From Swiss-Prot:
TM regions (residue ranges): none
Main location: nucleus
The encoding gene: TPP1
Family matches, as InterPro entries: HAD-like_sf, HAD_sf, PNK3P, Polynucleotide_phosphatase
Signal peptide: none
Keyword DNA damage: yes
Record carries keyword Nucleus: yes
Catalytic activity, as annotated: a 3'end (2'-deoxyribonucleotide 3'-phosphate)-DNA + H2O = a 3'-end 2'-deoxyribonucleotide-DNA + phosphate
GO CC annotations, alphabetized: nucleus
Protein name: Polynucleotide 3'-phosphatase
Keywords, comma-separated and alphabetical: DNA damage, DNA repair, Hydrolase, Nucleus
Protein origin, superkingdom: Eukaryota
Gene3D superfamilies, A to Z: HAD superfamily/HAD-like
Length: 238
C-alpha cells in the first residue's frame, strides 16, 4: 500500500508512506489542488452521480486522447517541485464507527484508485507526490455541542470547537490546515528551518455554481484560499 490511511471522526486522509524527495529550496513547492468526484473520476454506471460500489468508478476522459490520470502524470513529469492534493467533500460517508458501510466503501474505493495510479507505467512518481483528504458527514453521535474529542492517533487532546465538521468541509478550508501540517512533517528537515513555502497554482473542481452544478462549494473554496479556480474542462481538455 503506497499511502497511510488515517480516519478521524471529521476527516479521512491518505498520505504517502514514502513521499518523494523534492528539492524545493527557498522557492517552495508548487501545489496543484483538485476535487475528486466528477473532476478526476466518475461512476462507471451510467446516469448516476455517486458510485454504487468501491469499484464503480473510472478516470474521466474530457477529450478522446487522454484521461485525467494522463494529465496528472504530465504535471508531475513537467514540474519537479509539484505536489498534487485532492480535497473532497463526502457527505454520504460516516466514519463513526470506522467500520461503517459508507466508510468502508469509500476507503476501499480510494485504495483501488491509488492502486490504479501505481500500476500505470507513469504512476509510480505520482503516487509518491499525491495527498488525499475527505470531509465526511457529522455522525449523530457527535452533536453540535460536543466539546472535546480525544484523538489517540494524533497524540493530542483536540479541544474541538462545535463546528469542526463544518470547518473541514468545503468551502471552508480546514482540510488545507491538515495538508500543510502533513507536508511539513514529510519535507521539513527540522523545526529550526522556516516553514515550507507553498505556491498554490490552482484549485480545480466541478462545483462552481453553474446551472448544471449541484453547488458552488469548489469555487467558493478557491476564493477562501485566495487561489485561482479552474474548471475540469480547462485543465483536462487541452
Amino acid at each position: 500500500m503506497s499511502h497511510k490511511l488515517t480516519i478521524l471522526p471529521f476527516l479521512i486522509k491518505f498520505t504517502p508512506k514514502f513521499p518523494q524527495s523534492i528539492d524545493h529550496d527557498e522557492h517552495g513547492l508548487n501545489v496543484y489542488a483538485f476535487d475528486l468526484d466528477h473532476t478526476i473520476i466518475k461512476p462507471k454506471s451510467p446516469n448516476i452521480s455517486f458510485s454504487r460500489s468501491a469499484s464503480d468508478w473510472q478516470f474521466i476522459n474530457f477529450n478522446s486522447k487522454k484521461s485525467t490520470l494522463d494529465y496528472l502524470c504530465n504535471i508531475i513529469d513537467n514540474d519537479p517541485t509539484a505536489v498534487i492534493v485532492i480535497f473532497s467533500n463526502q457527505g454520504g460517508v460516516i466514519t463513526v464507527p470506522r467500520t461503517s458501510k459508507s466508510c468502508t466503501k469509500y476507503t476501499n474505493k480510494i485504495l483501488l484508485f491509488l492502486k490504479a495510479i501505481k500500476n500505470d507505467e507513469r504512476g509510480e512518481t505520482l503516487s509518491h507526490r499525491l495527498w488525499l483528504y475527505a470531509a465526511p458527514k457529522r455522525p449523530k453521535t457527535f452533536a453540535a455541542n460536543h466539546s472535546k474529542i480525544t484523538f489517540a492517533s494524533l497524540g493530542e487532546s483536540y479541544n474541538n470547537d462545535p463546528n469542526i465538521f463544518e470547518k473541514v468541509r468545503k468551502p471552508m478550508t480546514g482540510m488545507v490546515e491538515f495538508f500543510k501540517r502533513d507536508l511539513e512533517s514529510a519535507y521539513r528537515v527540522s523545526e529550526q528551518i522556516s516553514p515550507i513555502k507553498l505556491n498554490w497554482i490552482y484549485y480545480c473542481g466541478d462545483a462552481a455554481g453553474r446551472k448544471k452544478d449541484f453547488s458552488d462549494s469548489d469555487i467558493k473554496f478557491a476564493e477562501n484560499l485566495h487561489v485561482e479556480f479552474k474548471y475540469p474542462e480547462e485543465i483536462f481538455h487541452g
